From Swiss-Prot:
This is BMP/retinoic acid-inducible neural-specific protein 2. One of its GO terms (cellular component) is dendrite. One of its GO terms (biological process) is nervous system development. It is found in: Secreted. Keywords: Cell cycle, Glycoprotein, Growth arrest, Secreted, Signal. Residues 85-281 form the MACPF domain. Inhibits neuronal cell proliferation by negative regulation of the cell cycle transition. Residues 1-33 form the signal peptide.
Length: 783
């Protein structure tokens, strides 16, 4: 609703017309110069208001819209439940005030009606005054600008905030008076009622406001606000006589100024501008100099520090100190927040928490994450404000003799907060908690605190770390990980107990001693075994044209169940008839612990670094030789049965190359053309027997399924792993070790295949948990 009242303000022109004076607005450094006929002074409060920088709102966080009072009022009412706003207003007409003195000069070419004192001061300056003279005689007396024109006006409005949820409810009225033209004790207020009251506001203001306030008190459904802006009112002209009311600073008014140099003679204008700039910028303490896009004050001898505004610098340094305090307050409030304290209470105290463990609890707490984001947002605002002040501070200190003194705040990283939690947990036994050092598991206490360290639980982890802390004292280790044993409060690598009760694998024979005994074929290292062959007999001559099979077996399961046997050498005494051209060839197969012939491995004679047969003559007349292959400590191996396959080849001399060549003999159908006969006198195995207790090993295996304690199961697994590795070390040469341990379980302990597989799986799983586990691939030998 607009109501123009321009016709009622036609009397304004006569009031403004007498202002034929030289006016200057009272901004900082400016004064008001008028003639003696109409002198007035701008109040000080207006001068300070106008001194605000016009672009200061750009440095705020949200801009002018969010700073507007109307927006703030609306947001406040909206939070209170008022969701609808009705506003009725009228805008006063605009009046433009012009400087008539300047109009007379421009349009009528009349001289300016300057005060006699002003004219005298201009003449006293002469034609070449210095800047100090201009400042003292003109600027300090009359200012730097004067009023050219101004636009004045105002607005009056009524705003009603409405909560529609409460509006339709019936209200009890006291005294039987109705709210709007009715009678009765109960009345419902509608939007139509509010519309009627708002329409009558500019007709009968007092009565309308009284009724609206009654509705506001009775229902709580509305909120009434009056607003008046601008210096003028349609019903009041009294305040037009004061300059303060005309020049009031409000968003509805516009004031246009002009430099005072336009009123001066030509020869004074340039000096006046220079003096005005120096006066405003340098505060009369120096002369403004601009060069290469930079301006500064050339200080006078009286004011050597005119370029260094100490008050402004000190104010900015104080602002930085306040920001630093606010920064610390933000961090302290975060530490004291419910989310942070709730995390501290949820952390377990039965084990030590390193930074990684705390980070996992931190990451799972969504409420703490949200609170930490709020902290980051607040610190980000402070950080931007700090940088803005620092840039301005360095600009001010650019030509100062001292550097600015400040300290930039530093954002605390996540690792800091994780360490802070450790400090509160383990270093909080004093008034002020200390700082926890994770590497040394100790606390650094404040200088005035003798001790701040509390009990630090044991550290859990893999390898030598604890598996559990002691229930009665969390600072001590209660149990260890697999492969470690608790000793004097520390977890040390567990070593398997001696295997002598299960299998004696130690021997005192050194390499030189063993070689001497084998050369002598000492009976003390002979393993007595049973000779079996269907093709021949010991000490009898036979025709070697066909392959002969013979074996030496021990039948340990039947005769020697408490022993296993190790072979160090194999020796045969072979005799040939005189002038025989046959050469014996042996293929050796070794069965380690029994079973079928297919579970034997072939001995790679003279392959790689494996030894070859050694032949020594025994009886020249009978042409007998001892054929011996020595394994020694390097190639010794378990054996239960040795299979020897004997065949022959023909030895001949190549005349062309003077070399011995061999070829297979042809089948002789005529006995008269026989190439010779062969005889085996002895077949011996040299080695030693080891004590072996299959029942003890079975009991050890039973502990895998029925352990007395967890420690007994781990000890049994360690012993079985040690036994497996020691047995497999005697595997024959090859790219892959043969799994002799499975053969031992299968044939000497009579375990089923599935039992053997289960045991091997348990050993592999346990071995993978041990420190520095050694895994190796094995080849299958026994089915």
């Amino acid at each position: 609703m607009r109501w123009q009242c321009g016709t009622r303000f036609r009397g304004l022109r006569p009031v403004v017309a007498p202002w034929t004076a030289l006016l200057a607005l009272g901004l900082p450094g400016w004064v008001l110069a008028v003639s003696a006929t109409a002198a007035a002074v701008v109040p000080e409060q207006h001068a300070s208001t106008a001194g605000q920088h016009p672009l200061d709102w750009l440095l705020t966080d949200r801009g002018p819209f969010h700073r507007a009072q109307e927006y703030a009022d609306f947001m406040e009412r909206y939070r209170q439940g008022f969701t609808t706003r009705y506003r009725i207003y009228r805008e006063f007409a605009r009046w433009k005030v012009n400087n008539l003195a300047l109009e007379r000069k421009d349009f009528f070419s009349l001289p300016l009606p300057l005060a006699p004192e002003s004219i005298r001061n201009i003449r006293l300056l002469g034609r070449r005054p210095n800047l100090q003279q201009v400042t003292e005689n003109l600027i300090k007396k009359y200012g730097t600008h004067f009023l050219l024109s101004a636009t004045l006006g105002g607005e009056e409005s009524l705003t009603i905030f409405v909560d529609k949820r409460k509006l339709g409810r019936k209200t009890e009225t006291t005294g039987g008076a109705s709210i709007i033209g009715g009678s009765g004790n109960s009345t419902a207020v509608s939007l139509e009622t509010l519309h009627q009251l708002a329409a009558s506001y500019f007709i009968d203001r007092e009565s309308t406001l009284r009724r609206l306030h009654h509705i506001q008190i009775a229902t709580g459904a509305i909120k009434v606000t009056e607003t008046r802006t601008g210096p003028l009112g349609c019903s009041n002209y009294d305040n037009l006589d004061s300059v303060s009311s005309v020049l009031v600073q409000s968003p509805e008014n516009k004031v246009q100024l002009l430099g005072l140099q336009v009123l001066l003679p030509e020869y004074l204008r340039e000096r006046f501008v220079a003096a005005a700039l120096s006066y405003i910028t340098c505060s009369s303490e120096g002369e403004l100099v601009c060069k290469e896009n930079d301006c500064w004050c050339k200080c006078s001898p009286t004011f050597p520090d005119c370029n260094c505004p100490d008050a402004d610098i000190q104010a900015m340094e104080d602002s930085l100190l306040q920001i630093q305090d606010s920064w610390a307050t933000h961090n302290r409030q975060f530490e004291e927040s419910e989310e942070f304290q709730a995390l501290l209470k949820r952390l377990p105290d039965d084990r030590f928490l390193n930074s990684t463990a705390i980070s996992q609890f931190w990451a799972m707490d969504t409420s703490l994450q949200h609170r930490y984001q709020q902290l980051g947002a607040g610190l980000k605002v402070l950080f931007k404000k700090t940088h803005r002040i620092v840039r301005r501070l360095f600009n001010l200190c650019k030509r100062c003799h001292r550097q600015p003194r400040f300290r930039l705040p530093k954002e605390r990283s996540l690792s800091y907060w994780w360490n802070r939690i450790q400090s509160l947990l383990y270093c909080g036994e004093s008034t002020f908690p200390g700082t926890f050092l994770e590497q040394s598991h100790s606390c650094t206490c404040p200088y005035d605190q003798s001790s701040c360290q509390g009990p630090i639980p044991c550290a859990l982890g893999e390898g030598p770390a604890c598996a559990h802390c002691a229930p009665d004292n969390s600072t001590r280790c209660g149990s260890c990980n697999p492969g470690y044993v608790l000793a004097q409060g520390l977890c040390r690598p567990e070593v398997a107990e001696s295997l002598e009760n299960f299998l004696g694998l130690e021997t005192d024979l050194q390499d030189l001693e063993l070689k001497y005994l084998l050369q002598k074929q000492d009976s003390r290292i002979e393993v007595h075994s049973i000779f079996i062959s269907n093709d021949m007999r010991l000490g009898s001559w036979f025709d070697p044209s066909w392959r002969k099979r013979m074996l030496l077996t021990l039948k340990s399961n039947k005769y020697k169940p408490g022993l296993v046997h190790v072979m160090l050498a194999l020796s045969l005494q072979i005799c040939l008839t005189k002038n025989s051209t046959l050469e014996p060839v042996m293929a050796i197969y070794v069965n380690p612990f029994g079973g079928s012939h297919s579970e034997s491995w072939f001995m790679p004679v003279n392959e790689g670094s494996f030894p070859d047969w050694e032949r020594t003559n025994v009886d020249a007349a009978a042409q007998c030789q001892n054929w011996t292959i020595t394994l020694g400590n390097r190639w010794k191996t378990f054996f239960e049965t040795v299979h020897v396959y004997l065949r022959s080849r023909i030895k001949s001399l190549d005349d062309s190359s003077n070399e011995t060549i061999y070829y297979e003999p042809l089948e002789m159908t005529d006995p008269s053309k026989n190439l010779g006969y062969m005889k085996i006198n002895t077949l011996q195995v040299f080695g030693y027997s080891l004590p072996f207790d299959p029942d003890a090993i079975r009991d050890l295996i039973l502990q895998l399924d029925y352990p007395y304690t967890q420690g007994s199961q781990d000890s049994a697994l360690l012993q079985l792993i040690e036994l497996r590795d020691r047995v497999n070390q005697l595997s024959p040469p090859g790219k892959v070790r043969l799994d002799l341990f499975s053969c031992l379980l299968r044939h000497r302990l009579k375990l089923a295949n599935n039992e053997v597989g289960r045991i091997q799986s348990s050993l592999r799983a346990f071995n993978s948990k041990l420190p520095n586990p050694v895994e190796y691939e094995t080849g299958k030998l026994c089915s």
